[in-house]
UniProtKB/Swiss-Prot annotation:
Alphabetical GO biological process terms: L-arginine biosynthetic process; ornithine biosynthetic process
The protein's name: Arginine biosynthesis bifunctional protein ArgJ, mitochondrial
Pathway: Amino-acid biosynthesis; L-arginine biosynthesis; L-ornithine and N-acetyl-L-glutamate from L-glutamate and N(2)-acetyl-L-ornithine (cyclic): step 1/1; Amino-acid biosynthesis; L-arginine biosynthesis; N(2)-acetyl-L-ornithine from L-glutamate: step 1/4
Keyword Acyltransferase annotated: yes
Involved in the stabilization of negative charge on the oxyanion by the formation of the oxyanion hole, annotated site positions: 145-146
Length: 456
């Protein structure tokens, strides 16, 4: 098939990154009309033609700082780690997360399972950016996304990197174009930005921006896709890594589209300190706590855009597991529900089949003993309109479900599933108040069609 995009019941799914995406009307609201971007960072999106079928759309993204950055990243746990993952890990290890200047990303080819030659290609991409920055030492992180098992057209990419560097810009349009350049089957670019303050400098404004991509092969086991976060706050790399790890565990590590973990998953953050102020160096400082809250909330909002763009998805579902003795057990239960094909297909079919949710809770592996007790487990649907929860199961006893109300709730795009492991208010029956939240989407006919045609 020679066409660049495939239409699936109104969803245009691109297999490289189009500049003039036919974004579905329902997704237009997620595209920012403006932004507040961190000082000292500039970006570009450039056409290379990584895939032969892409004759004009940007598929090479470059994010660069005028000054050296502290950097941190989290990577996929898939055993078949892609060449760019290996290259970026090596760069961070060699630099100890200091002095990083850029991130370069191509879409259209994952450069995964490509052997020694693939690793050399990834290293050469970073080296070419370093050359453009006038640097001899490795200072660029590399990411790739696309089809696994194919070599990059590396000569074409290396030839275009100087163009990408010469067109770096800090405008909103440039940030949006760059976010578009990393898309594959995404139906819209995923870009957010915000301002914040820190306790030590209450009158100083800091900025945080981030872009991510992903719509399929999304289920975390340390990261879930590609993402780059940039801030002009001063943060030492020793503090940046735990900040990112915490944020990812409660955001990109808490989403699922289809239960698959990619070979290329990488989330990176760069902090250049361009806004000034006292550097965050201690994990026990007030600034660190404030930054942790800002970064985690921001990462949650950014990661949720991936779920909202899940391949073939018609629903955005929050599953909240509460009244657990520990966070990890609650997270495992939420994760199991989120990746259950039976739960996901029931939601697509607008079927209030709570038995499938209960089944997923019951077979969850790795939870602390005594966490799941049928006689104190409750399940309910929580409507987005703020009305009362629809109770499905209370203390292990099924409720007489109002099917008409259930149908109304399930008709909505957004839905929350609440699982209470204590059967009542937090803290009852000797349990703690630990809670975990996961975000996921449903499974539809379109998901099968999209992925059945992925390489065509």
């Amino acid at each position: 098939m020679a066409t660049f995009a495939r239409m699936v019941k109104g969803q245009v799914r691109y297999y490289s990154a189009p500049l003039d995406m036919a974004i579905p009307a329902s997704k237009q609201k997620y595209i920012p009309a403006s932004g507040t971007y961190p000082k000292g960072f500039s970006v570009s999106g450039t056409h290379v033609g990584v895939k032969a079928s892409n004759t004009r759309f940007p598929d090479l993204a470059l994010i660069s700082s005028e000054t050296p950055c502290s950097a941190a990243a989290v990577f996929t746990t898939n055993k078949f780690q892609a060449a760019p993952v290996q290259a970026s890990k090596n760069t961070l290890k060699a630099t100890q997360g200091e002095g990083i200047r850029s991130v370069v990303i191509n879409s259209g080819c994952a450069n995964a399972v490509t052997g020694k030659g693939g690793l050399e290609d990834a290293v050469s991409m970073g080296a070419k950016v370093d050359e453009c920055n006038g640097l001899a030492q490795p200072s660029t992180l590399v990411m790739s996304t696309g089809v696994i098992g194919q070599r990059l057209p590396i000569s074409k990419i290396l030839d275009k990197i100087p163009t990408a560097h010469s067109t770096l810009s800090s405008t909103h349009d440039s940030w949006l174009t760059t976010a578009r350049a990393i898309c594959t089957t995404d139906t819209f670019p995923k870009l957010l930005s915000q301002t914040f303050t820190l306790p030590s400098s209450p009158n100083r404004t800091y900025r945080l921006a981030g872009m991510t991509k992903g719509a399929g092969m999304i289920h975390p086991n340390m990261a879930t896709l590609l993402g780059v976060l940039c801030t002009d706050a001063p943060i030492a790399s020793s503090a940046l890594q735990p900040l990112l790890k915490h944020a990812v565990s409660r955001s990109f590590n808490s989403i699922s589209v289809d239960g698959d973990t990619s070979t290329n998953d990488t989330i990176a953050i760069l902090a250049n300190g361009a806004a000034g102020g006292a550097p965050i160096t201690s994990t026990s400082s007030a600034d660190y706590t404030a930054m942790q809250n800002v970064l985690t909330s921001f990462a949650q909002s950014l990661s949720q855009l991936v779920v909202r763009d899940g391949e073939g998805a018609t629903k955005f579902v929050t599953v909240r597991v509460q009244n657990s003795p520990d966070y990890e057990s609650a997270r495992l239960i939420a994760s199991t529900i989120a990746r259950s094909p039976l739960v996901k297909t029931a939601l697509y079919g607008k079927d209030a089949n709570w038995g499938r949710i209960l089944c997923a809770i019951g077979y969850t592996q790795g939870v602390a003993e005594g966490t799941v007790v049928p006689e104190r487990t409750s399940v309910s649907f929580k409507p987005v309109d703020g009305s009362a929860e629809l109770k499905l199961l209370v203390n292990g006893e099924p409720e007489q479900v109002d099917e008409d109300r259930a149908a109304v709730i399930l008709q909505e795009e957004d839905l929350e599933i609440v699982v209470d492991l204590g059967g009542g208010e937090k803290g009852e029956k000797g349990l703690g108040g630990e809670e975990a939240i996961y975000w996921f989407c449903d499974f539809s006919h379109e998901y099968v069609t999209i992925n059945g045609d992925y390489r065509t």
